[in-house]
Curated annotation (Swiss-Prot):
Family note: Belongs to the reoviridae RNA-directed RNA polymerase family.
Places the protein is found: Virion; Host cytoplasm
Record annotation: effect of changing K746R: In strain: Isolate H
Effect annotated for changing L244I: In strain: Isolate H
The protein's name in its UniProt record: RNA-directed RNA polymerase P1
All copies of domain RdRp catalytic, residue ranges: 690-897
Organism: Rice dwarf virus (isolate Akita)
GO terms under biological process: viral genome replication
Region (Disordered): 157-181
Enzyme class: transferase
Length: 1444
């Protein structure tokens, strides 16, 4: 390392400050500084000289480091890194500040040394929800072990080539004897009893030590993507650089320093924090004390929040003191997070409701800003029902004064006053005076953004614990057992005033009527995108029914032996599972056993059978999946959440039940996931009318979904009621669900054509019956759902639960929850109107268990009326068997929370719950590039709502990703044996290199969007182009080899098709395949069965239609690739399924090593590669001029939980209003997606558009006929093909929206007014003769660049002038479409040059039609290809992920 170690800190601080101070004129210089920082940190991280020393080579080749296996060297390196971390923390900080909290910290350390040893933990404590604190080893023994580490022999050096088996055993024994033991008191170990509902004895025993250590490894694991020590160092140094005079100090790091001093002793090389991680972030373990890992996690999370949410505290002394107080409290009591959260629950709900004279002072009082300034929508009217087809924001202005004082006083009831008083006392009782002072600021009404900032600062601290993990068996039993008893009482009629008979007296007929009417509406074609498919259509679409969000399956384990190696695949891919099962997946018989507890089942057996089964269970000769199949039981999974919440159960639906639901209720879900096709006639869902209540009718990925509620809060004249029910699924009784299904059956039987000749599923227990009709499937599913038993498993402990309620893994969970919630809401609204001054409901919405109701507030003037509304709401939910907390049923005219969307006085904000470093579970990615691209998506999403500086936060994310981006590379000798392992870091520009380059991560430089090709071209190309050649070499090919090899194996008889598939060089000969699965439906299968199922689903009529269309197109000189032809759909589907398989990491983690190793000897100059080589459309675009603009919109800022630059964008451009571009959340057309989904195609929307352009059908004399033939060749379906062709011809002007939403959707520009008429204020496209639609696309390209510049200009707005290279555009257009024979004949042999200054066109014989050079772009232009966008392909919402 060129720098002396003592110089690293001041040098890095200087570099960071230069970057922070840079502006748009200094972008490239700032990036050069960033690359220097990355170089210094990488060298610091790896502790040895790299094998590529020249800086130019570093930029082109990356860095190589030898990987040491010497434990002493590794220990010394990490000790030095920890020492640097502590020196950085203390750098230029006065000693009194450093030692300010030493007494508290030493008390924390003393407590850690006095908690019980692990063997003193009682059985009850071992089973607690939160892992109890305990010691693993005393400090003296730990220090001795650290010394022993240094003398442990290197196992790899002892291996001899001719070593015998006995020598190996002796060597292993020596190794075990010399290896340190990190758990003291093994002689005190004992066995504890755990529950096991799948054993005859209902229990089993295990060692206490094993159980506690297994819990520790599971519940303390943060699932990082890189080692946390470099992350701590980077976060701290950036906080230092960003804070005033570099004086920031972390008492979390101070705690770590004192712990290292205490347990490491005087030797520097033993002073490492006793938590172990691998270089890839894998959790290895902890030493001495159980809760060191969670404390390290809290410290890293705390520093990250302070950096990325810096605008909340602005490094002010009071806010930092509050943060330190809470952090030290949690370090002292790491299991008290739930208690802290509970202490402020109601302050979190009823903030800013107390109206008093200070509220109208419009100034700063005691340091609190009471200035009245917020967005208001003056046109919002809630005196009558609001019935929008599409939710969107209206124009907002800035409100400077109160106009609704009556409601201000009415909502602050005595009950609410009591809640707040109790919470303030709770905080005081925790001995947190600074926090008490902070939360006291949340009581008074402050109608501006500062109260949201104060609330967010509190919530940030509540999220310090990251993802909370606990003993899920304990958590589940506590919740489910209590609810099960409550449900049984309700079902038995124990309470004569609240029971199932009273509920179903009104709910059952209403449910049945809704199911009946919506089914009839679908059958009669009222909802075009919802229909009941034929059995062949259903089977051909089966891959779309089993999406990533659908039913759960057990692991499918596949062993694939090729002529070169053996691959192991472990997957939960539903598509792979279906293709392995074939038609067996449609057989309900294996999952139709009556659910029984094991003890009950054994009683039904003869003594001999019972004894044999018990013996088989105890010996393990019967698998768990087979036993659960016999017992008719299903599995429960789990989800971890943040803010110390308990682990939530996820009930896993079996695939057969999921498919049954897809066939019978799937069309109902489809009817409610698309926007209204006609104006709603009322608020309510009746089946005939969808009403306005389903959130899925308005979802577009933005806050538009509840625009009416947010606007209502801006006026203060409407009353919002927010119902919060707990454990909705578990209290939604099956007895109230079945009537809806009965209504479906009733309609199907009336409309007999839908229930005849179609056999969707089979029941192999019924011989001589061809299959099950829809009405029979309804009967089967009603029987299936009446009672289930689910089994939860955790660390080998298993517990079975009887379930007579909605389970969360069902296809219809969200839909049916919404239906029942809407019906209850209607009852509430009718009673409120009757009993509370004729108060009418103006608007409502439900999203599963969430409900929001907006009432006309003109007749509300007293707290008694508000209290009455609360009582009516709570009682109606309770009478429906739901658990609702009156304290959490918020009634407010100014604030609310719904489906994780928060608002206050017309301002919108999000909870800071996204974790940057931690993950809920390990990434499913099979290589580091894929994993870090996923991490990049997390960074991007996190930074959009982090209330700090976007530039700083984006830089932070890039540095964290860059330090984690390393690849293990092996060097081989002449005999192809490994003789050295190296750690390779790609060129540092790989972090922002777009993802089209194999090793590019595509992270954002500006923070606005991913894959910022144009910005790189304009400002960073000199640096980025140096490394792109090598970055493109970093490819992980094992998954591609497996998918291609399997396709070649199973499609070996389809030689022409294989040729067209172009499987390429990544191909190996498959010699054998074996399957295993833990799923109870799996009975040993093969992918050939899935292929047979797909072949059988080919419709003969459609096949002939497809073939005829292919022939017709061929006669016009147009070829349809065989890979897309309808008759080859089964094969294409299987190949697509293989692409979902992930090879185990041991096989897939290595890249093309020989190419990379060759870089060490490569002396020739490595060529530069243009960033536009993979994105040629950007070669067309130049920014010819930039003029300063000194005007802003002058409007309000609605979106508060955004970075500083996000608010600057909103201020400059204007806040979101009106119907924006056709944003689908991921840039797709519902029409195209519906065509793909409804026909079971495997082509993506992108590929379909590309096929349309390149096929040449748009250049035919009758392009509409050509489109129909093309779509029919793919689908064989005439009706949907004609509809899509008509859509293409009719909707030409909107095709640019596809690319616009790829650019803007999900970015901060989503919060702005991005309508074209507004965009033209900031962008000019210098192409006056260009067709308007294409011109419009270039406007949006310039608009994104405008925003990127603004971010780097400190909010200074500029006008962007976009010019187009017309010669390149002409070549680009010509290259994007082949010239057909008919086109040649039409154009003639002599063509004039294309005149791009005019809208040049060819006159053709068809009346009133012309073909323009731009027509391909008007209809579906190449610009909609993925040359930019905020969604990496592997992490975007794809068609197959759409909810049914």
């Amino acid at each position: 390392m060129d720098l002396a170690r003592s110089d690293i800190i001041p040098h890095l601080l200087c570099l960071f400050q230069e970057i922070i101070q840079a502006n748009i004129q200094k972008v490239s210089e700032a990036y050069d500084l960033e690359l220097k920082i990355m170089n210094i940190l990488t060298l610091w991280r790896n502790g040895s000289d790299n094998l590529i020393s020249d800086n130019d080579d570093y930029m082109k080749k990356g860095l190589f480091f030898s990987r040491s296996n010497d434990p002493l060297a590794l220990q010394a390196r990490y000790a030095q890194m920890y020492d640097d971390l502590f020196k950085l923390n203390n750098y230029k900080v006065p000693d009194d500040v450093v030692r300010k909290h030493d007494t508290k910290i030493l008390d924390i350390i003393l407590k850690e040394s006095s908690v019980p040893f692990w063997y003193d933990i009682s059985d009850d404590e071992a089973h607690e929800s939160m892992l109890p604190e305990f010691r693993l080893q005393d400090i003296h023994e730990f220090r001795l072990n650290l010394k022993r580490v240094a003398v442990v022999p290197d196992e790899s050096e002892e291996i001899q080539m001719d070593e015998s088996q006995s020598d190996k055993r002796r060597r292993k024994k020596r190794m075990e004897k010399s290896r340190p033991v990190w758990l003291s008191g093994s002689e005190n170990d004992r066995r504890i009893e755990l529950n096991d509902s799948l054993k005859p004895s209902q229990k089993f025993e295990t060692k206490l030590s094993s159980y506690l250590l297994n819990r520790l490894m599971n519940e303390m694991n943060p699932h990082y993507c890189g080692h946390p020590l470099p992350a701590l160092f980077v976060t701290l140094i950036m906080l230092k650089a960003y804070s005033l005079k570099n004086k920031f100090f972390s008492y979390g790091i101070r705690y770590m320093e004192l712990v290292c001093n205490e347990i490491g002793g005087p030797d520097l090389n033993t002073r490492t924090f006793p938590v172990l991680f691998g270089s890839d972030g894998s959790f290895v373990g902890t030493r001495v004390y159980s809760h060191y890992p969670i404390k390290l996690r809290m410290i890293l999370n705390d520093l990250t929040y302070l950096l990325t949410y810096s605008d909340l505290h602005k490094f002010q002394e009071f806010e930092l003191d509050v943060n330190d107080e809470v952090l030290l409290h949690m370090l002292h009591s790491p299991n008290d997070g739930r208690q802290l959260k509970k202490a402020v629950t109601r302050l979190n709900l009823y903030y800013g409701l107390k109206f008093n004279p200070k509220t109208t002072d419009c100034g700063v009082v005691n340091g609190m800003d009471f200035t009245h300034k917020h967005p208001i929508t003056k046109t919002a009217d809630f005196t009558s029902p609001v019935l929008p087809m599409t939710n969107s924001f209206n124009k907002a202005e800035i409100c400077y004064g109160h106009s609704s004082k009556i409601l201000n006083r009415a909502v602050f009831t005595d009950t609410v006053r009591g809640y707040i008083r109790e919470d303030l006392k709770n905080v005081a009782d925790l001995d947190l005076p600074k926090l008490h002072e902070h939360v006291s600021k949340l009581v008074d009404m402050r109608v501006n953004y500062t109260i949201i900032y104060d609330l967010m600062f509190l919530r940030v601290m509540l999220n310090l614990g990251g993802y909370s993990r606990s003993n899920q068996i304990t958590d589940f039993r506590k919740t489910i057992d209590e609810i099960t008893k409550m449900n049984e009482d309700f079902l038995s009629g124990a309470d004569p005033e609240k029971n199932i008979d009273i509920l179903n007296a009104w709910m059952a007929p209403t449910m049945e009527d809704c199911g009946y009417r919506l089914t009839k509406s679908i059958l009669f074609g009222k909802f075009r995108k919802a229909k009941y498919p034929s059995d062949l259509e259903a089977k051909s679409n089966i891959d779309y029914y089993v999406t990533a969000r659908s039913a759960g399956i057990g692991n499918l384990r596949i062993s694939i032996e090729t002529d070169k190696r053996k691959y192991k695949v472990r997957t939960t891919s539903k598509s792979a599972f279906v293709n392995a099962m074939g038609s067996g997946i449609l057989d309900v018989n294996p999952v139709s056993n009556e659910p029984m507890m094991l003890t009950d089942y054994l009683l039904t057996q003869t003594p001999e059978t019972r004894a044999n089964l018990e013996a088989a269970i105890d010996s393990g000769s019967i698998s768990d999946s087979e036993l659960m199949r016999i017992l008719g039981q299903n599995s429960i999974g789990s989800r971890s959440t943040t803010a110390w919440r308990p682990v939530r159960p996820i009930y896993i639906n079996v695939l057969q039940a999921h498919l049954a639901q897809a066939f019978i209720i799937g069309p109902h879900i489809n009817a409610t996931v698309n926007q209204h096709e006609s104006q709603p006639t009322s608020l309510w869902f009746t089946g005939d009318d969808l009403g306005v209540g389903f959130a899925t009718l308005y979802q577009n990925g933005t806050a538009d979904i509840i625009a009416p509620a947010i606007e209502a809060s801006s006026t203060g004249k409407a009353l919002s009621v927010l119902a919060d029910c707990s454990s909705w699924d578990q209290t939604f009784l099956t007895a109230t669900i079945i009537p809806y299904y009965n209504g479906i059956k009733k309609a199907l039987l009336e409309y007999q054509q839908a229930d005849m000749r179609n056999f969707y599923m089979i029941d192999s227990s019924r011989t001589g019956v061809p299959g099950m009709k829809l009405s029979e499937i309804v009967d089967w599913f009603n029987s299936f759902q009446t009672k289930r038993i689910f089994n939860a498993s955790y660390l080998k402990e298993r517990h079975s639960f009887v379930v007579k309620y909605m389970w969360s893994g069902r296809l219809d969970t969200f839909f049916m929850n919404s239906v029942q919630n809407a019906l209850i809401t209607r009852r509430i609204a009718e009673e409120v109107s009757l009993k509370v001054s004729n108060t009418g409901l103006s608007w409502f919405q439900v999203a599963g268990d969430d409900a929001i109701m907006v009432y006309d507030g003109s007749s509300i003037s007293t707290t008694e009326q508000v209290t009455r509304v609360n009582e009516i709401t709570v009682r109606n939910y309770e009478e429906s068997n739901h658990i609702i907390n009156p304290q959490k049923t918020v009634i407010s005219h100014i604030s609310g929370e719904y489906a994780k969307i928060y608002y206050y006085a017309g301002m919108h904000f999000r909870d800071p719950s996204i974790q940057l470093h931690e993950s809920e579970k390990d990434s499913g990615a099979s290589d580091v590039t894929e994993s870090l691209r996923g991490f990049g998506q997390v960074i991007y999403e996190y930074n959009k709502r982090a209330i700090g500086t976007l530039r700083v936060n984006a830089l932070y994310g890039r540095l964290i990703a860059g330090l984690a981006y390393s690849v293990n590379v092996r060097r081989y000798d002449a005999s192809k044996r490994t003789y050295a392992n190296m750690k390779y870091y790609p060129p540092p520009t790989s972090v922002i290199a777009p993802a089209a380059f194999k090793g590019g991560l595509g992270l954002s430089f500006t923070g606005l969007s991913l894959n910022e090709v144009l910005f790189i071209k304009m400002h960073l190309h000199e640096a980025v182009s140096q490394g792109l050649h090598v970055i493109s070499m970093i490819s992980f090919e094992a998954n591609e080899v497996v998918s291609n090899s399997l396709s070649a194996y199973y499609l070996k008889d389809q030689k022409d098709l294989l040729r067209d598939m172009k499987l390429g060089k990544h191909l190996e000969k498959v010699k054998g395949i074996s399957f295993k699965s833990s799923d109870l439906a799996f009975s040993g299968s093969d992918f050939s069965q899935g292929l047979n199922l797909k072949r059988e689903s080919i419709d003969k009529v459609k096949l002939e239609v497809s073939r005829k269309s292919i022939r017709d197109l061929r006669s016009s000189g147009i070829s349809v690739p065989s890979t897309h032809a309808y008759e080859n759909l089964p094969y294409a589907s299987l190949h697509q399924s293989f692409k979902s398989l992930k090879v185990d990491r041991d096989t897939s983690k290595f890249t093309n090593e020989r190419l990379l190793v060759s870089l060490l000897e490569y002396k020739s100059d490595i060529p530069r590669v243009s960033v536009t080589s993979q994105y040629p459309v950007y070669d067309l675009i130049n920014i010819s001029k930039v003029d300063e603009l000194n005007v802003r919109s002058g409007g309000p800022v609605r979106f508060i939980s955004t970075p500083i630059e996000g608010k600057l964008l909103e201020e400059n451009i204007g806040t979101r209003q009106g119907v924006q571009f056709k944003n689908r959340g991921y840039g797709g057309s519902q029409e195209v997606l519906h065509f793909i989904r409804s026909n079971g195609l495997v082509i993506t929307e992108q590929a379909l558009i590309d096929l349309i352009i390149k096929s040449g059908v748009l250049l035919m004399i009758n392009p509409q006929r050509g489109l129909i033939d093309l779509f029919q060749s793919l689908s064989g379906d005439t009706a949907s093909s004609m509809h899509l062709a008509n859509f293409f011809m009719a909707e030409k002007p909107h095709w640019e929206d596809n690319a616009i939403s790829l650019t803007i959707a999900g970015s901060l520009l989503e919060n702005c007014d991005s309508r074209i008429e507004n965009v033209k204020n900031f962008v000019s496209v210098l192409a006056t003769g260009m067709q308007k639609d294409l011109q419009r696309m270039f406007y949006y390209v310039g608009f994104v660049y405008y925003a990127q510049r603004l971010i780097w200009s400190g909010g200074h707005s500029s006008k962007i002038f976009v010019s187009i290279d017309e010669d390149k555009l002409a070549d680009f257009l010509r290259g994007s479409k082949p010239i057909t024979r008919r086109r040649k004949a039409m154009a003639g042999t002599k063509r004039e040059p294309i005149n791009l200054s005019a809208n040049f066109s060819y006159e053709i014989s068809e009346p009133d039609r012309e073909i323009s050079e731009y027509d391909p772009l008007v209809l579906c232009h190449p610009l909609s290809m993925p040359f930019f966008g905020n969604w990496q392909e592997k992490y975007s919402v794809m068609q197959s992920d759409e909810q049914m």
